[in-house]
Amino acid sequence: VLFGIPYFGLSFVAQALVARGYESLGIALSAFAALAIFYLLGVARFRALRYRLSRTRWRGIRGGSDTAGFLFGLSYMWKTAVGWIPAGLLLPWSMTSLWNERWSKMSFGPYAFEADAEAGNVFARYLLFYLTPFVLFAGGIIMAGMGMLAGYGVGGEEGRALGGMIGIFALVPFFYFGLGLIAVAFFAKFYREVVGATRWRDLNFTFTASTLDWVKLLVVDALLVVFTFGIGLVFLSYRHWKFF
């Protein structure tokens, strides 16, 4: 509500300006609205973590941050943009850098957190996820060609068309499930890296969930929602909190 209403309000004003002939002003206002939402997303991520720490108590001691997160919003903007500029290849750096910056501004009691996660430790998993669509696309072409040849040998021209379609459709499940599994493998490695690189004074944190653990979590989430006709959504936050 806080983001949506102002954004759609500015978008409506921008469209009205364009309709009245003020194209440049309307485009500028639309760009400003998009950048404002982008900035506020970064601030919101910072404040969400600060809020959770402020509600975490241990023997009367609680966490938080001395900063409001406004500068982090700017860091979120430029680091995310830089991560996407070279065809998305710097996204692991962007994600680890933002994690380090966000946690390094947090504290629990009188002691600050420290985080020094390195993107190089997760880049191999990310590169696997990044290149998989291209490999699957090439595999789809090969399978379609093989299906066309097999179909042509059985049913001529009609068989060739049918064989090509079968070859392509046979690759669709591998594309969705394979790409999804690799994405889960990347995030499993990412969280093991960033949590393991986070410290609080002399206390080092670890996160040992494997890719299989993540798959089990997501599959059970889906089954819980489907077989309870959506009622299970209310239990997902508890499951995720327990998982982490």
Regions found by a protein language model. Give the residues of each.
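Interfacial aromatic "cap" segments that immediately flank transmembrane helices
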Residues: 1-5, 61-83, 111-138, 190-231
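Transmembrane-helix bundle segments that line or gate the permeation/cavity pathway
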Residues: 1-105
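Membrane-helix interface segments in multi-pass membrane proteins
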Residues: 7-37, 136-183, 237, 241-244
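Juxtamembrane interface at the ends
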Residues: 45-53, 92-112, 182-202, 237-244
